[in-house]
Amino acid sequence: MDSGKDMWSRLCLLAETVVMAAEEEEQRRRLLAEKREDSKSQKKTVSEEDDSEKRFLSHVPRKKRSSLVKRQQKPNGVSTSSSSLPDLNQIPIDYETETKQNPSFIERLVCDEEQRVKKGKSRIIWEEEEEADEDSEKRLFEKNLMKFVGHSQQQQKFETLNGASSSSSFLNLRCYEASLFLDYNTVESEKTETKVLPNPNYQSSSPSSCLTENDTSRKRRAVEQRKSGKVKKVKVSPLPRLSTETPEWVFQAMGHMNADAETPKLIFERTLFKSDVNSNLSRLLIPFQKLIRNDFLTPEECRAMQEDKDKDDEDISVGTILVCQAKQEDEDKDDEDIGAGTILVNQRFKMWGLRFKIWGMEKDSGHGTLNYILNWDWNDVVKGNSLKAGDNIGLWTFRCRGVLCFALDTW
């Protein structure tokens, strides 16, 4: 009996040992399978992030320079590249599909990037770029200051010859305002730059006589206009929107583009004019004085656009040039004056690659105004959104991977 009990206990112990070993083996296999799945999911996430970044960089406007176009010309003189920008919405979402269909896709991007690095230019100003030294900012300030002082001295000599006072010529100088001395333009300076400064040497009579003369001349003009039937119509500006809250679709577009986590900023609202939708001009004019806020640019972007504007001023001050040379220089200058590359998105999440830069307008009176402009593919934006004169638009700014982006709101 004792031997039978011992045998039975040994069998039970052996069975329990086998069951425990099987359970441990099953648990070990399960842990190995989970580790493999985790490693696969991590690799997939990294590859998806890389593909997403490559797709976003492909949306950035890449306008080839004239020198690159000449190098890529065929022996018979026909250029192999197109100067027009590609439609951003026709780019495949799957980056691997684009690479398979066009094997030279990656090589072309790398070649374009290397050429821009050699030229010392960049289509996009990134936030991670190193800030310039204080010495370069001082040199830029002194350069702009000498320009304005030189212009004021020329104006002073001209007015002195005509019998005007020398002090008034400098005080009434409003060509390009003092906001250009620095990289940032302030709202206060824009408000004060439109005011005409008084002439201290002006000998006038009593204030009451000035008011009386102005009132009488105004009344005479009104009576003459009534008699002739020519009455000027008063231009009434359209009422702005009652609410300036960020539209919901702007946040949706930021999520769709995987934009940086920041609050979008409303910088500009206006009713479109005929010049804004003119296909020959192909630009949206954004006057400095109409900006709602001006803190949406980085110091690097301000410095890059200011350097492009200085080049434009130097080109204008050069003497007479032959017509053929002027045309060639205009084409080269259009390629070199990059400004800041931007992306504009509308309410349907359709995107365009544009250029954002400073543009100065000179008037017949000798004074000038400074503006921002959006150009390059602006005609496509007008067609894609059916914009026309009289439409109201608003521009919201945000950043995606450090790139300046605009959201176009219409109402």
UniProtKB/Swiss-Prot annotation:
The keyword DNA-binding applies. It is found in: Nucleus. Residues 25-89, 192-237 are annotated as: Disordered. Coiled coil: none annotated. Residues 309-411 bind DNA. Residues 26-56 have a biased composition (Basic and acidic residues). Residues 60-73 have a biased composition (Basic residues). Its main location: nucleus. Keywords: DNA-binding, Nucleus, Transcription, Transcription regulation. Pfam families: At2g31720-like. InterPro entries: At2g31720-like, B3_DNA-bd, DNA-bd_pseudobarrel_sf. GO terms for cellular component: nucleus. PANTHER family: B3 DOMAIN PLANT PROTEIN-RELATED, TF-B3 DOMAIN-CONTAINING PROTEIN. This is B3 domain-containing protein At5g38500.
